[in-house]
């Protein structure tokens, strides 16, 4: 089943595709998730040998979805001792098959300001 996350106007809408139409499954507050369309069905399975830094987009009973760069990664919900907060910028690591999420360190960015 194709599933996507639509974030706009402060709302987070979980949709699934049925016969070419997108139907709403759940509508809730977006919180800290940035506006956009996130195709959850295109998510790749998380590499358990790497540390993955990014924003937690969505969590359901089976999976936790995280945006890493421009890609979406899917973690198994059962691997987490405690599921991370939606919208939080988290660093997910695996140790002995269990996933641990902690707040990712802020990256310093050099920019111009006036």
Q: Locations of the language-model features?
A:
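Flexible glycine-rich surface loops and low-complexity tracts that mediate binding to linear polymers
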Residues: 4, 9, 84-105
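A general sequence property marking short-to-moderate contiguous segments
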Residues: 5-42
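Structural detector for short beta-strands of small beta-barrel domains
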Residues: 27-60, 89-94
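Acidic, low-complexity, intrinsically disordered interaction modules
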Residues: 57, 61-72
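Non-Sec secretion/translocation targeting segments of pathogen effectors
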Residues: 65-66, 104-114
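Beta-strand/loop nucleic-acid-binding surfaces
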Residues: 68-86
